[in-house]
Amino acid sequence: DIAAIMFTSGTTGPSKGVLMPHAHLFLFGECLHTHMRITTSDKYYITLPLFHAQGLAMMTYGTMIAGASAVLKKTFRASTWIEDIKKYEITLTNLLGAMNDFVLAQPARDSDSKNHLRMVCALPVSDQTLHKLRTRFKIPKFFEAYGMTECNIPISRPFDAPDTAGCSGKVWDEYFEVIIADPNSDEELPVGEVGEILVRPKEAFCFMQAYNK
C-alpha cells in the first residue's frame, strides 16, 4: 500500500510526487537505525520538514524504529541550533548542505562543545567543514550516505568506517544492487570509468512505486 506521496527536492528539474510504499519509508528509517546505531537512549533533533524524505522517512522513522526520543522543531534556525542541542541533551541530528555553513557562521562560544552529540548525519560535507564542526562542537562521529526519494539509501557509510568527507560508503547489499553503467547500453563499466548509477532493490516495495500523475 502507498503510505505517502513525497515530493523530490527538484535538483534536476521540477519537483515530482513520488508514490512511497510503507516498506520504502520503513527502510529509509532502518538505514539510519542500523548505520547510526540508534538506541532507546538517543534523542534525535529534527528540524527538516516532514514532507521531505530526510525529515520523515530517515529521521522520524529511524527514531521510532529504535524506540528513541525526538525533538521536532517547526523550522531550522542556525541561531538557536546549538542552544537547542544543549537544552534537550540531543545525541543525534542531521545537517543538510548549507545548514552546516549556517551553523558555523554563528558567533562561537566556549560552551559550544558542552553538548551530548555523539553523531551527526552531515551531507554533503567538505573536509574543511567537517574539521570545523568536529573542532568547535566536539562531535565524535559523522555519517554520510547516497540516496534519493525514489530509490531509498542504497549506499551508506558503516558505523565503524573512517569519517572521510565526501565518501558515501558502501552498497547496502542486504537490500540493494548498485552498478556504474554505460548510459546508452546499461552495461556495467570497469572500475574507474564514469557512468550512470543504476540501483535495483532486493526486497519488494523498498523502492518508489511510480511518480504521481
Annotated model-derived regions:
Residues 26-43, 51-91, 106, 177:
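Conserved AMP-binding/adenylation subdomain of ANL enzymes
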Residues 173, 187-213:
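Conserved ATP/PPi-binding loop(s) of AMP-dependent carboxylate-activating enzymes
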Residues 16-19, 46-47, 68-75, 143:
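Short beta-strand->loop structural element characteristic of the AMP-binding/adenylate-forming
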Residues 3-27, 158:
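Conserved AMP-binding A3 loop
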Residues 96-99, 203:
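Beta->alpha turn/N-cap motifs
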Residues 77, 99-100, 126:
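Alpha-helix capping/helix-boundary segments
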Residues 3, 43-46, 51, 197-198:
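Short, well-ordered beta-strand segments
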Residues 65, 82, 87-95, 104-165, ...:
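Gly/Ser/Thr-rich phosphate-binding loop
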